[in-house]
Amino acid sequence: MASKEIKFGRTGREKMLRGVDILADAVKVTLGPKGRNVIIDKSFGAPRITKDGVSVAKEIELEDKFENMGAQMVREVASKTNDIAGDGTTTATVLAQAIVREGNKAVAAGMNPMDLKRGIDLAVADVVKDLQAKAKKISTSEEVAQVGTISANGDKQVGLDIAEAMQKVGNEGVITVEEAKTAETELEVVEGMQFDRGYLSPYFVTNPEKMIADLEDVFILLHEKKLSNLQSMLPVLEAVVQTGKPLLIVAEDVEGEALATLVVNKLRGGLKIAAVKAPGFGDRRKRMLEDIAILTGGTVISEDLGIKLESVTLDMLGRAKKVSISKENTTIVDGSGAKTDIEGRVAQIKAQIEETTSDYDREKLQERLAKLAGGVAVIRVGGSTEVEVKEKKDRIDDALNATRAAVQEGIVPGGGIALARSSTKITVKGANDDQEAGINIVRRALQSLVRQIAENAGDEASIVVGKVLDKNEDNFGYNAQTSEYGDMIAMGIVDPLKVVRTALQNAASVASLLITTEAMIAELPKKDAPAGMPGGMGGMGGMDMM
């Protein structure tokens, strides 16, 4: 076992704080409409330019083990916020840094870290309640576009594209973002279906960089039971091979010998194939397989219908223009099912939604309806160079996630104003002075976003915060894009409540843990073995020692 280095108390916390500062300082320059870019060097290809906080955070690894611990904890804040809300990573990082800094000062001044943590938790719960009371539900396409525009750093076209996509496929519909072959960004809505089952073996992958399997003009075999061997399937497999087209198998499971045979055939190049598990369980799985069959114009191979695998012919297989399979999801695009059949199935599901009394069943039926009726919207991101396209794609991904979050929980005034206002409305009291200090730490941290946005815009942060808090109006704030003060919601500067709430809760959670850390353990760096004596130089003979 390698030797360890241990740091205690203040020494350890200061090292950790340095790591927090390094990561947060690199991330927070991207905050706000006038946030700057960060360039990330890549070991292959051109450097990447981004304004996406989590992309910056993920690239940071520090040499000093103790500093790196602090940096990685804050990176966790950004990643977790991104996973839950899909945006707000820079917000979470700025808040975490502010809480850790203030908390560290309080601990150094002799306050009890556990009481500080309790105070922080009390204040955060109070702020979340205040934000939820202030949140405004969004319903119109214009409001959706506003949220998208803000999250895409003021790019109005992105906001409009997202609003249009959501209008066409519904709030629950599937929207994907791809790189375009042209310089223009365009929106395309294609009928299709996505379900949460990925490929059964990574050997089916056709695009190793993105780890996805793309099949074009594909046959789809829908089987209700498990497939353990392929003997009974040989006639249909041979028929598919002769067409030269790929095959997707959707079954309860494909296991053992059957999966191994498919993988070997795929690797040898004899058969373009992929296999996924059927979505859902029990009766719901049967219904979803029927949905896929109707969408693709195929037949479910089911013993209930008296159809056996040996008797399957090509015309019983579904067809689709494209199937895209990732580790977690399968998307079937442009199935060749008859429009009248799809409309009939949609009407049937709508009738079931009306009749059901179970909330769970209703939710699942609505999911199926969205998959059948909504289709898939594809935003194709264009640009002059590959670097520009990747940067724009990052922003559109953020904007899409923020918009979905806004539809779920509503919106609050943007530009850090909602949190700054909440700092003046914390009414909860701590049980002692140290808890009260924890509450005040959150109070000060909540103003850090407005400060950072103003700093990035080249304005005097203290003056901006003072002016904003002087006026006792919930929506009054500072528009860094135009350097004007006014009603943030009227100016279209809004943030999704889910993003703001998640960022604050995650930042406070990790910051509290850092404040209450008393010992840190890391491996000692390995010492290099001393270099050996140089060998004698050939051809010169030995040297006489005098």
Curated annotation (Swiss-Prot):
Alphabetized InterPro entries for the sequence: Chaperonin_Cpn60_CS, Cpn60/GroEL, Cpn60/GroEL/TCP-1, GroEL-like_apical_dom_sf, GROEL-like_equatorial_sf, TCP-1-like_intermed_sf
EC numbers on record: 5.6.1.7
GO CC term, one of those recorded: cytoplasm
Single GO MF descriptor: ATP binding
Keyword terms, alphabetized: ATP-binding, Chaperone, Cytoplasm, Isomerase, Nucleotide-binding, Stress response
Catalytic activity: ATP + H2O + a folded polypeptide = ADP + phosphate + an unfolded polypeptide
Chain residues that bind ATP: T30, L31, G32, P33, K51, D87, G88, T89, T90, T91, G415, D495
Compartments in which it is found: Cytoplasm
One of the Pfam families matching this protein, by short name: Cpn60_TCP1
Keyword Isomerase on entry: yes
BP-aspect Gene Ontology terms: protein refolding
Major location category of this protein: cytoplasm
Induction: By heat shock.
Keyword Thylakoid: no
Subunit structure, interactors included: Forms a cylinder of 14 subunits composed of two heptameric rings stacked back-to-back. Interacts with the co-chaperonin GroES.
Function per UniProt: Together with its co-chaperonin GroES, plays an essential role in assisting protein folding. The GroEL-GroES system forms a nano-cage that allows encapsulation of the non-native substrate proteins and provides a physical environment optimized to promote and accelerate protein folding.
Family according to the record: Belongs to the chaperonin (HSP60) family.
Protein name listed in UniProt: Chaperonin GroEL
